[in-house]
Amino acid sequence: MKKGINRVVLVGTGAVGCSYAYCMINQAVAEEFVLVDVNEAKAEGEAMDLSHAVPFAPAPTRVWKGSYEDCKDADLVVITAGLPQKPGETRLDLVEKNAKIFKQIVRSIMDSGFDGIFLIATNPVDILTYVTWKESGLPKERVIGSGTTLDSARFRYMLGEYFDIGPHNIHAYIIGEHGDTELPVWSHVSVGIQKLQTLLEKDNTYNQEDLDKIFINVRDAAYHIIERKGATYYGIGMSLLRVTKAILNDENSVLTVSAYLEGQYGQKDVYIGVPAVLNRGGVREILEVELSEDEELKFDHSVQVLKETMAPVL
C-alpha cells in the first residue's frame, strides 16, 4: 500500500459490483480501484469503460482489471461475486451454493497477504460474512457485511414519502437478518426531532396500520424489484459506497451493517445487521439500543433462523 493512496479491490463484476464500481468512480472515493472476476474479459471490459468516465469525475481514479495478487496492497476488498437471487427464491436459499464459492475466493485473497478490511454484499450476506470471517482469520472488526444498510435506507425513503419529509431527516433503522426475518425498530423512529409515537398521538392523519404496510413493502422490496427487472443493484451499490466512505474517510458513522455479536443484544457467535460505528479500523463498536419486548423476540428469532441455516455450511 502506497502512502496516502487508498486501494479498493472489487471481486465480482456482475450488476451489483458494477453499480458499486460506477458509484466509486463517480464520487472518486479511492485513488486505485481494481476489478477481479473469474470472467477476466468481463472485468477488463468494465475497467476500460469505467476508465473513460474518470475525466468527468471530481478526482482521478486509476482503474484496472487485476487478480487476487492485487489484494496484497488493498485497504478494502469488496465481494459481490456469487449466484444471484432468482424470482421466488429467498436469500437463504442461496446459502450452500454461495458459501462454497466464497470459501475459495477468501482463501485466494488471503494467500495474497491481504491484511485490510472485507466488505461483503453477496447473499445471504450475514452468513457469507461469517464464512469470510472464519476463512480469513482476520479480527471480527475487519470483516463486515452490508447487513441492513439498504433496508434501513428503503425504510427511511418510504417513511419520508408517507410523512412528506426528506429521508435524510427520517431517523429509522431495520435490524436483523438482511431478509425475511428483519425487523423495524419502531421504538426508536423519529421524524426530524419528533418521536414517531408522539407524532401519531398528535396527528390522526397517520396510523400504525399504514406504517406496518410500509415495513412489509421494505421487507419485500427486493422480491418486487426482481419480479419486474430481474435483479436489484442500484440501491445496494449506493449502500456499499456509503459503507466504503465511512471506512476510508475514518468517519465514525453509524450504519446498520452485518457485524459480529459477542454478547450484545443477548446474542453470541453470529453476524447480523445492527447499528455499528464504522471507521478506518472497521467496526469500532456496536451500539446496543434498548428494544421493546416485541422487538427483542423478533430479533432473537432472526438470530435463530440465521444460525440454523448457517450450521450445514460451516
From Swiss-Prot:
UniProt modified residues of type Phosphotyrosine: Y223
Q: What is its EC number?
A: 1.1.1.27
Q: Which reaction does it catalyse?
A: (S)-lactate + NAD(+) = pyruvate + NADH + H(+)
Among InterPro entries, the record links this protein to:
L-lactate/malate_DH, L-lactate_DH, L-lactate_DH_AS, Lactate/malate_DH_C, Lactate/malate_DH_N, Lactate_DH/Glyco_Ohase_4_C, NAD(P)-bd_dom_sf
Q: In which pathway does it act?
A: Fermentation; pyruvate fermentation to lactate; (S)-lactate from pyruvate: step 1/1
Q: At which positions is substrate bound? A: Q85, R91, N123, P124, V125, D126, D151, S152, A153, R154, T232
Its predominant location is cytoplasm
**Broad enzyme group:** oxidoreductase
Instruction: Say yes or no: keyword Oxidoreductase present.
Output: yes
The record's active-site residues are H178 (proton acceptor)
Q: State where beta-D-fructose 1,6-bisphosphate binds.
A: R156, H171
**Control of this protein's activity:** Allosterically activated by fructose 1,6-bisphosphate (FBP).
Q: Name one Pfam family in it.
A: Ldh_1_C
Q: What processes does the entry annotate via GO biological process terms?
A: glycolytic process; lactate metabolic process; pyruvate metabolic process
* Sample GO molecular function, one term: L-lactate dehydrogenase activity
Q: Name one GO cellular component term.
A: cytoplasm
Residues that bind NAD(+), according to the entry?
Answer: V16, D37, K42, Y68, G82, L83, A121, T122, N123, S146
Where does this one sit in the cell? Cytoplasm
Keywords on this record? Allosteric enzyme, Cytoplasm, NAD, Oxidoreductase, Phosphoprotein
Stored SUPFAM superfamilies: LDH C-terminal domain-like, NAD(P)-binding Rossmann-fold domains
PANTHER family xrefs: L-2-HYDROXYCARBOXYLATE DEHYDROGENASE (NAD(P)(+)), L-LACTATE DEHYDROGENASE
Give the protein's function: Catalyzes the conversion of lactate to pyruvate.
Family to which the UniProt record says this protein belongs: Belongs to the LDH/MDH superfamily. LDH family.
Quaternary organization? Homotetramer.
Q: Which HAMAP family match?
A: Lactate_dehydrog (MF_00488)
Q: What is this protein called?
A: L-lactate dehydrogenase 1
